[in-house]
Curated annotation (Swiss-Prot):
Name by which UniProt lists this protein: Glucose-6-phosphate isomerase
Keywords, alphabetical: Cytoplasm, Gluconeogenesis, Glycolysis, Isomerase
Classification via Pfam families: PGI
GO CC field: cytosol
GO terms classed as biological process: gluconeogenesis; glucose 6-phosphate metabolic process; glycolytic process
HAMAP family: G6P_isomerase
Amino acid sequence: MSAALTETPAWQALQAHFETLHSVHLRDLFAADPGRGERLTAEGAGLYLDYSKHRVTDETLDLLVALAHARGLPERRDAMFGGEKINVTEGRAVLHTALRAPRGSDVLVDGRNVVPDVHEVLERMAAFAQQVRSGSWLGHTGKPIRAIVNIGIGGSDLGPVMAYEALRHYAQRELTVRFVSNVDGTDLVEKTRDLTAEETLFIVSSKTFTTQETMANAQSARAWLLSALGDEAAVARHFVAVSTNAEAVQKFGIDTANMFEFWDWVGGRYSMDSAIGLSLMLAIGPDGFRELLSGFHDMDEHFRTAPLEANLPVLMGLLGVWYNNFFGAETLAVLPYDQYLAYFPAYLQQLDMESNGKHVTLDGQEVTYQTGPVVWGQPGTNGQHAFYQLIHQGTKLIPCDFIAFAQTLNPLPLPGGAPHHDLLMANVFAQTEALAFGKTLEEVLAEGVDAALAPHRVFDGNRPTSTLLVDRLTPRTLGALIALYEHKVFVQGVIWDVNSFDQWGVELGKVLARRIVKELGADEPELSHDSSTNALIRRYRERR
């Protein structure tokens, strides 16, 4: 960028506007504009966004869109979709969007159309999934597969496990699907404790087939299998790989015909719609997986073509910048009111925090402003009985994303009362209303509350929320929802001028761990860390 972000006219215009708006209450904004709740909405790819309960005016939105133009967002978006190497620190294109491009599309990387490669892998995945799901893929002893265990970590785990839990309603119930990620042996032991080796298939997901945690778990899973079946040949019937390292895969004992590849233009946290999603395809079937991809593509097209002022990822991204950089908000709460989305906040933690948790700009200069927020959350209504107290009456401003579905997948009547889903949705609407408008001291006193107690019953309100209301949770709408957040993160990375597609921050600890693990196994060599680390290692040696 030619000028530091905070020195640009667009930023300074927003700063001046903030000084006049930051003390204005949402009560006043709604009172001045009776149609605000219907006007400040947007729709795309089957998702409906109500952003009227944000501390913004039309002028705010115009200034935010002007900032996006000033930072070159449309051009950067087109560069990403066009296959330019926008991951500058690794010299790579960023083309997770190609993973869901329809057959016949053209997406070029170094002059070569990669879409045929994507669909060739998808067809191989589908053929394999059909074999397993139909029972025609037999294990070493001739029994069909009844359990799938995905072994991966980071993007090779968080996306698949989130999507599997989200789409469990559509899964083949005869198949047990589990996910092992933590190098803590407890994870593998507990996930395999009640499984039968003869009927278990492991998917080892590691692009390089060298990821420390994944390969430790894979080797232990291999030993578990062989302890039951004895024959090395069994590995080829009970393990498949998602990788590009054919030599290492073959050495492990996996038939390379059962190795499903993906590409260096796919980042780990953006890879769940590649072969990394094989476990999900096994669960929901090839048709369901293709519907998921269609939902991703729906949002890709919306992001690529919709005007910025009506573009869901752009609006959500810019609103996040507004609170992060002007109001000083440090976190974002993601609150899905659907139990199937229990893992969605954890998935977004990696997507957002690994992407935009950066302290230097694209050209290596230290930033002078805040970048990515801390992302967290829990399904409703559980969170209401845990941390909503702080959101309502605490001293920290916490913008919230509420996600809800008009139709439940599990209608459950309540004898003598409203259906469960009506109870759930009533809480969605009540929470966003309470957060926006609160309750004044005068209103509390008018209810006859004792004057000494009344201050404790006051809700300041003016807490900003977005509400995403979707008709129904399906593979297609889930794909659109995930892509919405992918592109929102991209928008913010462009505004902050950071590389949203590398993750150097995870490297230093990994390097040190490789050194330390050798030191844990013996009293020598002499430790040469800081005094704290040395003391902790010695104590561990003594007490293990």
